[in-house]
Amino acid sequence: MLLHESAASMEQSMPENLSTHMYGECEVNPTLAKCPDPVNVDHELPTKESCASTTIVSTSPTSATSTTKVKLSFSVDRLLGSEPEESHRQSSSSPSTKSCCDGSILACCSFPHCFSQANAESRRFGHATLPPTFTPTSSHTYPFVGLDKLFPGPYMDYKSVLRPTPIRAAEHAAPTYPTLATNALLRFHQHQKQQHQQHHHHQHHPKHLHQQHKPPPHNSTTASALLAPLHSLTSLQLTQQQQRFLGKTPQQLLDIAPTSPAAAAAATSQNGAHGHGGGNGQGNASAGSNGKRKRSWSRAVFSNLQRKGLEIQFQQQKYITKPDRRKLAARLNLTDAQVKVWFQNRRMKWRHTRENLKSGQEKQPSAVPESGGVFKTSTPSGDGTPQEALDYSSDSCSSVDLSEQADEDDNIEINVVE
C-alpha cells in the first residue's frame, strides 16, 4: 500500500496533462522495458510506477502477487473513492492480464496505480480530468512515456494551485494608512450617529437607557480601538490650530475679536480723540466692542514730524501721484495706504473749507492754498474762523481727528451738493 500511495503522490506532483498512463490503466510491459538507466537510453524512459510494478511482479510468486494486489486495489479504491466497476475489473483480472495487452502506450492495463489512482487523486484535489470518450492518437510505436511529463497541456493547469496564493496574501496583508483612515472615519460617523440617537432616547426614556447601555461596552471598546488613528489625526489638527492661534500677537487677536471691555477701553485710549473728534472716536470704539466694526485694521497715530511732512507735500500738490506718494511714504516711514488715506481726508477737509467760505464768509478762497500759518494770520475777524483754522493745522490735531472730521465733512458735502 505504501508503494501505491507513493506512486499516486508522485503522479499528482507531476503535470498529468499528456502523460500516457492517464487515458487508460496502462503499464509498460516488463518484457519491453526493464527500467533502463535514463543516462544511457534517451528515448525509452518508462515511469517510476512501471518500474515499481515490475519489481513487485518479479520478486513475489504469482498467486501471492495476485491476491495481495486484489486486496490493495480494494482498500485503495475504498480510501480514494474510485468506481466499483474498476475494482471489480481489477479483482477479476489474472496475473497474466496485469500488463499491457499489446505493449502500446494506450493499452488496457489494470494496475491500480496507473489511471484510477491518478483519477481519484485528481478528483480529490479538484483538477479537471479528461473525459473517457477522448482518445488521443500517438505516433510512437514503442512505449515512450518520459517526455510527455515535461510538457503541460490544456487539461490540467497546475498553475491554478499557485494562483490563489498571492491573492490571498494581498487580501490578508496589512491595509494601507488611507484605507485605515477612511474606514475609521466611516465608523466614527456611525458611532456618533448611534450616540446621538441614544442621547435622544435618554432624554425621553431615562429608565430604559441603563438596560440599553449594559450590552454595548464591548462595542465601545472595539470602536475606540478602531478609531485610534482618527483620534491621532484630530489631536494633531487641534494642536496645530492651537499653535496657530497662540502664535498671533495680542493686537491681531484684538483685531479679530475685540469683545472684552478692557480691549474696548484700550482701543479708546489708543484712538484718544482731541477736540471735535472725541465723541466719534468713542463711538467707533464702542461699535468695535460690539463687533460691528467695519475696518479690520487699527488707525495709525502719526507723529508731529510725519504730519508736517504730509502737510508740506499737500500744500505743494493736492493730488499726489503714485510715484511721489511712494517716495513720501518711504521718506516718512509710512505705508502707501496710510499716505493715500491721509491725502483723501485732507482733500475732503480742504473742499469743506472752500464750501464754507463760499457760503457767506469774508475769507477769500485764494488764501486757502497757502500754509496754515498764513491762513491764521490772514483772518481779519470772526470768532469761529480761527478755531476752524486751528483744526486744519498740522500741529493742533492728530490724524485720527482728521479722519473723523473727514467722515463728518463727507456727510456735509453730500448734503450740500445734492
From Swiss-Prot:
| Predominant location category | nucleus
The source organism is: Drosophila melanogaster
Region (Disordered) location: 190-223, 259-296, 354-418
> What is the documented function of this protein?
May play a role in pattern formation during embryonic and imaginal development. Is not essential for visceral muscle morphogenesis.
GO cellular component annotations of the record: nucleus
Q: What keywords does the record list, in alphabetical order?
A: Developmental protein, DNA-binding, Homeobox, Nucleus
UniProt keyword DNA-binding present: yes
Q: Which Pfam families match?
A: Homeodomain
Instruction: Please tell me in which tissues this protein is expressed.
Output: Expressed in cells of the visceral musculature and its anlagen.
By its UniProt entry, which InterPro entries does this protein fall under?
H2.0_Homeobox_TF, HD, HD_metazoa, Homeobox_CS, Homeodomain-like_sf
Q: What protein family does this chain belong to?
A: Belongs to the H2.0 homeobox family.
Instruction: Give one GO molecular function term.
Output: sequence-specific DNA binding
Keyword Nucleus tagged: yes
Which regions are flagged for Low complexity bias? 259-273, 391-403
Q: What is this protein called?
A: Homeobox protein H2.0
Q: Which residues bind DNA?
A: 295-354
Annotated Basic residues bias: 190-216
Query: Where is this protein localized, as stated in its record?
Result: Nucleus
